Amino acid sequence: MDPSQPQVKRPASSDEQPSAKKTDTATSKGIAHLKPEFILFNDQNGSSRPMAGEYNDEEESTSSRLESQPANQIKGKKQNSKKKRGQNKNRDNRQVREQHALCSKFVTNVDATCSFDTKCRYVHDVREYLSKKAPEIKTEFFPICPVWQSLGHCPMGYKCCFLSSHCNMETLELKDLYEVDERKKLYEANHEINHIDGERKYDLIKRRFSFTKSDYILEIIDAMQQENRDLMNTSKGSETTTDANAGEDANDEKVSFQATEKQNQLTEKRERQRELYLKYHDTRFFAQEKRKLDLHHKKIVSPLTTVGNLPYRRLMRKLGADVTYSEMALAVPLIQGTNSEWALPKAHCSEFPGFGVQIACSKTWQAAKAAEALAANVTGVSEINLNSGCPIDLLYRQGSGSALLDNPARMIRCLNGMNYVSNDIPVTVKIRTGTREGHPIALSITKRLVLETDVAAITLHGRTRQQRYTKSADWDYVGEVANAVRTYEAERQENKNLRDGQKIQFVGNGDCNNWEDWYKHLENKNMDSVMVARGALIKPWIFEEVDAQQYMDKSSKERLEILKDYCKFAMDHWGTDQYGISQCRRFFCEFMSFFHRYVPMGICERYPVLLNERPPNWKGRDDLETLLGSTDSNDWLKLSEMFFGKVNDEFVFTPKHKSNSFATN
């Protein structure tokens, strides 16, 4: 037993009294303290079974779009000895579509016609399609189509996996549950927003979209940069210019027409830059009137790639969250009109107001154009957030995410460009304490953010990029930065050119997984709120505890109801056809990769369980609780069958962590 750890006293009968080795397991550093009757032991000397594997929380910020980068090469012996550890870097969870797919024209109309006629590669005969369609889904939780039940009609029509609940199978007549007016009311209360118009997206794809504001602000920023370069190199520039002019005089007749034209263009450009510099150098040229952003004591869910999808955010709204964010969208694919990227700003109507879109970029032009495209094409956005904290290697090497911490001048240019083009949508930023362990730089960066930008909010994650999740977040430093921000704001107020700025919201982030942490961090009056990430994945009811200011020992049935809500929201979003159900099941398993980590309060000797504490293998108070806590991805699939029916042969799911991949014999 570690002598630095206090021994936990607990009542136990003589026959239940654990041996010394059991006590070691329960009180070891980094291990959750469980009641001995819930710890699973597999030998006579009292040692517990080893844990299934360590959690790697890089999943919080990694998605299939970003994880296909080559893994580090590991030498043979080491690789073989750790074959069940680490991440499945090249996993591909894309789902297979139907082989005999129904033509979209016939999805809700058996008598429709298709302009491609016999040349169409899809099925036109509805009865033929139904004869080859996979068996219908019928579960205890969803005996009828949940979408049809909530909206009054099912957009999936004959493709729906619950078809018999809203179709006369003899006449193939589709049934509506409510009249048109009633269905409109239901739609108003349950629909998705931020759909980009098809023509506008096509303009982006064909590069016909006019980035008028971006072009202008980028020209101003370039002029400022050029002037600064000239000022720094005045003497050197003068000598160079003199030498160049001498050369030109000596070789006047040899200068080509093309070179002259190029020189004229450069001269015109430099004159234009000089004009812009003189016009704007003493102004906050990027300032725009914005909607007020209020994050004070709001319950905020962090942007979460892959798992932070629309159904999850909708679930968190139902469970008490005030502010949610999209998954991180990459700026360049947004500018190019990529479908997968434009799916990310979509939100449920319950999320707005209080919904932010997060983008990642490496260049100023990317930030400005992505922000302008968003502001012009989506209306349900409360803020646009610049991700300057993502630790993923692929993005870091490209200059995105936390790489901007190493280049604060570029970060500031990105934010100012975004602020100018985003109309009345506030711009915010999320940063880390730094990139290298032991070298925090957030204090110096936040000073520049306060004085040189108009950001409406700053979120600080209390770790460096290098630390990732190996150490606890440094909340002392986060509090120090929060205090400094108010000092910098006071300094800004003294400057007549800067004092028009609104109060900057400051949000702390990192390791908050219970209501006591929440209120402890907010004892610092300079902290506006706390952003919750993994804590809200493992325990989605965390904001209910914040409101009640007490811990809630959710039963297995209550937790299963939470999963039911998630599945219902997933089918509303991805659909109830075969492909949609596969997508729902896949993201259900992604959600379970965090949700299973909850250790029930009733089996713990010490509570709360910290995020970096891992339990020994345990059994729950009932079989369902044990199943919900399983680390085996096969058990997650069993849980999914309660909601989505039997897993078909075409379904594909590879867990993020290899330690979750084992099969139970």
Swiss-Prot record:
Biased composition (Polar residues): 63-72, 233-244, 257-266
Region (Disordered): 1-97, 233-268
Composition bias, Basic residues: 75-88
Annotated positions binding FMN: 303-305, 358, 430, 461, 509-511, 533-534
Subcellular localization, as worded in the UniProt entry: Cytoplasm; Nucleus
Reaction catalysis annotation: 5,6-dihydrouridine(47) in tRNA + NAD(+) = uridine(47) in tRNA + NADH + H(+); 5,6-dihydrouridine(47) in tRNA + NADP(+) = uridine(47) in tRNA + NADPH + H(+); a 5,6-dihydrouridine in mRNA + NAD(+) = a uridine in mRNA + NADH + H(+); a 5,6-dihydrouridine in mRNA + NADP(+) = a uridine in mRNA + NADPH + H(+)
Acetylation is among the record's keywords: no
Top-level taxon in the UniProt lineage: Eukaryota
Listed name of the protein: tRNA-dihydrouridine(47) synthase [NAD(P)(+)]
Taxonomic lineage of the native organism: Eukaryota, Fungi, Dikarya, Ascomycota, Saccharomycotina
